[in-house]
Amino acid sequence: PVKFWGDDDGQKYHKAYFTRFENIWHHGDFIERTNKNGFIMRGRSDATLNPGGVRIGTSEIYQQVEDINFITEALVVGQDFDDDVRIILFVTTKNNQEINDEKSKLIKSRIRKNCSPKHVPAIIIKVPEIPRTKSGKIVELAVKQIINGEKINNKEAIANPEALKFFEKLSQLKL
């Protein structure tokens, strides 16, 4: 977009697209330039994990956990850890079930079998609620920023910002 509705001075527009890199428009999509100067859209760059240098789309993991009978929703992000990235999977469960060792092993086994060992989350954590945008999309970026000790951008776009408090208090993910 060239501007936001109701953003007469352009501050919201600038914050959304120009704060990550100085004087460079950053929209959050990962693209690949072809040898014929075309571009291939690969998806959201903030929805890409990179453990051990292997690029993984979060949707690959979501596809594996969405139809596990005790999981209602999932959110997956990468956390910078030991000069690499570790995958953290957050889930909500039916009837508030706990994620015990047996359930954790089932989730990891399914991901390993249908994807690869690099896709397997290092940690699986049950959460009370998944944060979402006002349009209903899962908010991966804010959770990733929290667990990596970064400042949250665009908190005003989150429909349920109180859900972020749980992630802020997770002691097992403190770096």
Where are these predicted regions, by residue range?
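AMP-binding/adenylate-forming catalytic core of the ANL superfamily
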Residues: 3, 12-15, 19-119, 138, ...
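Hydrophobic/anchoring residues in structured secondary elements
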Residues: 76, 125-126
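Flexible lysine-rich "adenylation lid" loop at the C-terminal edge of ANL adenylation domains
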Residues: 127-152
